[in-house]
């Protein structure tokens, strides 16, 4: 699958990111049992495996889908190219925006 060029705007505070040095997120792949609250589902949780299936990501490509988390084994904030988590969405109370983009390394 081609993931380059995809981006999302999230609430930095909800993602645990601030302007402080060393404030960061974690990117890895899907882990068995992963859950998230997909944007648009009003806080209802869903298995990541079901979300990837519904997005028609071929089974052979699912292990390479970038998963952005709050930390190692942390809460999922973005399934890159598929869906953001409801808990990380921007709201009227959002004070700091976080734009995440996928780019190909040189």
How would you name each of these model-derived features?
Residues 1-106:
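Basic, glycine-rich polyanion-binding accessory segments appended to enzymes
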